[in-house]
Structures are given as structure tokens and as C-alpha cells.
């Protein structure tokens, strides 16, 4: 790699996502800052650098994690932010890196990790949310309606206190399944998509004392998804 480029962010940046927020064909950045509870937007300069814009978003109190996707199918990318107190905030994009005011979606536990996928194959993005801490624990799917709103589902049990969530096709059926981590059980949990808007928890398997982050990829080139898991305490 070339020398690093340092860009000024807010206080305690904890999450960064890439997306084309100004629709010029280049990936931009959105950075979630935990301490000052803001999101900063950085436009791609097209020369290996990013320019911090004057756009500052305020999703709400105690943001935890963030993803991007086009939730209302208008060709403009949006943001979804998990909040500590049983909410996911949806910020619909208006173009040119600007967003509408956040709209809350209540979930049944304390949300930690969040992923985006089309779990029912209807060409509308859905959201998977890991729930841990206070309230109920497990994984909850927010089914996309197509206009930026979502329908909640029952909690998928299993996996203890999930802190990480990722999409994975474990059975090669073309549908995204899920894998979550649990520091309480020191394990990873596979959750199979039944292709009818329900999921089945398959099994837990050991993955170190404190599995915190997971990456899914085909590392062996055999057409099957593999996992790489980080453990900060091992």
C-alpha cells in the first residue's frame, strides 16, 4: 500500500461505510462518530483522496453501527443506523450527499450489528439486526416494503448475545443466510434462510474467547463460503 491518508472525523469514529452518495459513479464515505453522535459525509475526489463535506447528520442518541442501501428504490443511497435504545434509524438520501430527517424503527432488543440483504428475493432490500444486551436477544429481520419503510419479524433465537452479523450462503441455494457471533458463548452461530421469510438456527461452533468481527469470503476457491473471525482477547 501507499502511505496512509489521514482525514479529520468527529469524536470517536466507530464505523465507516462506502456508497456513492452523490451519484457520480465514485464511492464516497460515511463515518459514524460515537461520542458526538454524528455522521460525516466525505466525497471521493477521484484521485485516491476524500473531501470532508459540510454535511453533518444527527441520527439520534448513542449510535452503534451503520449500513447503506437504496431502501426506497429511487436510485439514491440511504443509511440505516442502530441505536442503543431499541431503535434503528432510517435516513433516506435526497441526493448530493444530503439526507432526510431520521425515521425510527423500533426493534425488540438492544441492536448491535446490522446488515443489508434481499432475504426473500423480491428485489427489495431488507435489514438484519443483531440484538444483545437489554431486552430480547437474537436476530430480527426488518422486511423492506420498497418505500423506505419496513415490517418487523419475530426474533430468531440462538447465538447468545450476538455482536456481529454477516450474510453467508451456507447451502449454495442462492439465498442469503446469516452468521452471528456471541462473546457470551465464545462461538459463531449459523442461521439458515428457509426461503419463506423464516429462518432456522442450525448450529454453534467454537471460534475463540471473544469473537468480535467476521468476514465472509471463498478463501479456498472451491465455491463455498468461508469465515475469518477476529478475537481481540486471544
Residue ranges: model-predicted function:
Residues 2-4, 24, 38, 183, ...:
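Extracellular beta-propeller repeat domains
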Residues 29-32, 79-82, 127-131, 178-181, ...:
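Hydrophobic beta-strand segments that make up the repeating blades of beta-propeller
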Residues 21, 34, 44-46, 71, ...:
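Inter-blade boundary loops/turns of WD-repeat beta-propellers
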Residues 1-11, 43-61, 79, 92-109, ...:
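Blade-edge motifs of beta-propeller repeat domains
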Residues 38-41, 87-90, 138-141, 187-190:
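A short loop-to-beta-strand structural motif that recurs across blades of beta-propeller domains
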Residues 14-21, 64-73, 112-121, 163-172, ...:
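Beta-propeller blade termini
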Residues 25-27, 75-77, 123-125, 174-176, ...:
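Glycine-aliphatic tripeptides that mark coil-to-beta-strand junctions in extracellular
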